[in-house]
């Protein structure tokens, strides 16, 4: 096993951080199973988390509710633990359209997905690190509670090689094939190996560097880590463990056993359907399942094989699937970031998944065992968590209940900054008043966030501000995580001064340039104007020395009053601490390079340099162009489209594709030339007519 965590921080804990670190660490060593950290915006919660993780010294899972914040956490924790294994585990889908059936229109939607190879590598690296070391931090989304291969099989099928070991070359090759590695002597890619005489070179599915095994007869003479492109030796190794190329591993006996169980379940289910008079459903189910069984027996897999995972893994009906949490040792730690959002998200996953699959089962598209290919229910998740720290600026009732009302507060910031000044102003004349405040921030080089209640109001306000010469952008619900990060970067770098939206970045993102948050119609009770939402939104200005929040409303609602009272309480604590210790608040400043690093999305570009050039205006928006300009634009759009796909951004890639068709049409190329010869996927046997739903959904 490797050495424990070594924390590298450019500064010592300050403000409330030392007390919070001590209380949380003491609670862990005391045996407190669930704790809650209330950390105000800008108080350095990630720094506190890193210190607690280092003190505990055991593998840790950090959960976030979306990929954007997970990417930010991954980058921050990687900088805190540069010599330890900080890994990233999110959905590996670039694009994911789940299988579904809509009875009202008799529409069957076949599963459609595109897997990102880089993310798949990071997922495999995360689990292999857990098998090898204790100093592991894995940053994950809700993907952590979805089905994964059995960790016992994953460990048992590992191929262990050491210098001086007696083993025949062909035995090594057979072992590699048995864990899903492919021999490819031409293209040396991830998850492949190649053979040159008594030398075997392997590129593990979870690594970027390859391994060279040199034999002398039936003895391993040398093991080296090499560059897969140049073949140059990087380091000599005494031993090497090669873990499977996939999390789900099957063999012939397993497939045969699973096929028998599937046939038994099929016979039982067909009898039930026929007895209920559902003859069409019975015929459909029999045709589809028999087709899948034939594919399983012939090639070892089939479309939708995950729906038979219960039989393949040998689980009982209703038994939960294995997931990432099963790969951790017994004494690991779970940290739930923005727990007021993440915990309810975990709780909601099971019901949504079951509702969709239940329709497939009822109408004969799937066997009932498909329901057991599912995420964990909340109680199962909690039963697998030995120690839990919830982290939020606004803990919800669930966290308070789980931690029995005991909360560790981190209210005082290391910078001495106070919570934003709050003002309540009337609705009448709010836009003119807002414009006056924006002008003042423009002169100081500061930024403004404006949040409204409706899309129409956001659009109208953005148009008005643009007419008044304000550099403003509008963030709407159609913008995905990657574009959102690009907009945040533009705001922080001063490409524009004002960002307008409905539910603007309430949680997590670091924007110290924002000095004013304006909340329009703050007196309208509802989810977007609850006390927790208001506190989170107000917190977007908490990292600026001149932080201020204006709540526009003609009355003070209960939610507004609670948000005002809590902000006032925090400001009082912070001010008294500063006065007692002679602290002068100082603002947070970031260089351009730091802003670019923090706002890059780590999903697939974590180790790539540079970005694709942004495409110019759409053909429909531009003035007439020369043929040369249009051909240049085609190249730009193609590059941007590929980059969007690599960055887990299928929706943007589709929009860029449509723009590409438009420009090619202007060039006189037929759309079919651009689209290629793609054919519609074939319907599974016995399925209803398929109609592709408009737009899939991004992987979790």
Curated annotation (Swiss-Prot):
From the UniProt entry, list the residue stretches annotated as the region Disordered.
Answer: 608-627, 667-700
Supply one GO molecular-function term: DNA binding
Annotated ranges, domain Helicase C-terminal: 430-596
| Alphabetized InterPro entries for the sequence | Helicase/UvrB_N, Helicase_ATP-bd, Helicase_C-like, P-loop_NTPase, UVR_dom, UVR_dom_sf, UvrB, UvrB_inter
Q: Which residues bind ATP?
A: 39-46
* Taxonomy, superkingdom: Bacteria
Q: Which residues form a coiled coil?
A: none
Q: Which NCBIfam families match?
A: PRK05298.1 (NF003673), uvrb (TIGR00631)
Q: Which HAMAP family match?
A: UvrB
The molecule here is called UvrABC system protein B
Q: Give the originating organism.
A: Gemmatimonas aurantiaca (strain DSM 14586 / JCM 11422 / NBRC 100505 / T-27)
């Amino acid at each position: 096993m490797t050495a424990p965590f070594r924390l590298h921080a450019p500064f010592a804990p300050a403000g409330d951080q030392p007390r919070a670190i001590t209380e949380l660490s003491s609670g862990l060593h005391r045996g407190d199973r669930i704790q809650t950290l209330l950390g105000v915006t800008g108080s350095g919660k990630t720094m506190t988390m890193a210190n607690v993780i280092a003190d505990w010294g055991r593998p840790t899972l950090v959960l976030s509710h979306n990929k954007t914040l997970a990417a930010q956490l991954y980058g921050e924790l990687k900088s805190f633990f540069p010599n330890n294994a900080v890994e990233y585990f999110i959905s590996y889908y670039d694009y994911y359209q789940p299988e579904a059936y809509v009875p009202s229109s008799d529409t069957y939607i076949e599963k459609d997905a595109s897997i990102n190879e880089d993310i798949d590598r990071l997922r495999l690296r995360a689990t292999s690190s857990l098998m090898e070391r204790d100093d592991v931090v894995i940053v994950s989304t809700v993907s952590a509670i979805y089905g994964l291969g059995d960790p016992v099989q994953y460990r048992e099928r590992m191929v262990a090689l050491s210098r001086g070991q007696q083993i025949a070359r062909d035995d090594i090759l057979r072992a590699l094939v048995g864990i899903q590695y492919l021999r490819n002597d031409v293209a040396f890619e991830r998850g492949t190996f190649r053979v040159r005489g008594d030398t075997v070179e392997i590129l593990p599915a979870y690594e970027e560097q390859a391994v060279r095994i040199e034999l002398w007869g039936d003895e391993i003479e040398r093991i080296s880590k090499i560059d897969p492109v140049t073949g140059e030796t990087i380091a000599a190794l005494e031993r090497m463990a090669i873990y499977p190329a996939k999390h789900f591993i099957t063999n012939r006996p397993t497939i045969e056993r699973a096929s028998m169980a599937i046939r038994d379940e099929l016979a039982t289910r067909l009898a039930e359907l026929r007895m209920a008079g559902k003859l069409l459903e019975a015929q459909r189910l029999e045709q589809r399942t028999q087709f899948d069984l034939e594919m399983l027996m012939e090639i070892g897999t089939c479309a939708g094989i995950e729906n038979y995972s219960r039989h393949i893994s040998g689980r009982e009906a209703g038994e939960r699937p294995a997931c990432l949490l099963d790969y951790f040792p017994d004494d690991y730690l779970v940290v739930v970031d923005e727990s007021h959002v993440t915990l309810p998200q975990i709780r909601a996953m099971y019901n949504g998944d079951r509702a969709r699959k239940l329709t497939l089962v009822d109408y004969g598209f799937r066997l009932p065992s498909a329901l057991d290919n599912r995420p964990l229910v909340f109680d199962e998740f909690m039963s697998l968590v030995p120690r839990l720290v919830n982290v939020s600026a606004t803990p919800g009732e669930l966290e308070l209940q789980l931690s029995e009302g005991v909360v560790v507060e981190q209210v005082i910031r290391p910078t001495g900054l106070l919570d934003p000044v709050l003002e309540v102003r009337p609705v009448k004349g709010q836009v003119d008043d807002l414009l006056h405040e924006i002008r003042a921030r423009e002169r100081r080089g500061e930024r403004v966030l404006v949040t409204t209640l409706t899309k129409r109001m956001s659009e109208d306000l953005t148009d008005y501000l643009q007419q008044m010469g304000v550099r403003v952008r509008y963030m709407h619900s159609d913008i995905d995580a990657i574009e959102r990060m690009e907009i945040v970067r533009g705001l922080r770098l001063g490409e524009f001064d004002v960002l307008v939206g409905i539910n603007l970045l309430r949680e997590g993102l670091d924007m110290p340039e924002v000095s004013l948050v304006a909340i329009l119609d703050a007196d309208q009770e509802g989810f977007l104007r609850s006390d927790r939402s208001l506190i989170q939104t107000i917190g977007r200005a908490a990292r600026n020395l001149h932080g201020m929040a204006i709540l526009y409303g003609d009355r003070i609602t209960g939610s507004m009053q609670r948000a005002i009272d809590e902000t006032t309480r925090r400001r009082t604590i912070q001010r008294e601490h500063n006065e007692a210790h002679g602290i002068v608040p100082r603002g947070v400043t970031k260089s351009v390079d730091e802003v670019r690093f923090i706002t890059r999305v780590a999903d697939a570009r974590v180790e790539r340099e540079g970005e694709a050039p942004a495409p110019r205006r759409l053909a429909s928006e531009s003035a007439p162009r020369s043929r040369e300009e249009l051909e240049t634009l085609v190249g730009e759009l193609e590059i941007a489209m590929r980059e969007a796909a690599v960055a887990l951004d299928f929706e943007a890639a589709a929009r860029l594709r449509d723009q590409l068709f438009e420009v090619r049409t202007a060039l006189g190329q037929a759309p079919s030339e651009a689209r290629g010869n793609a054919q519609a996927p074939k319907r599974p046997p016995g399925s209803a007519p398929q109609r592709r739903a408009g737009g899939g959904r991004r992987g979790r």
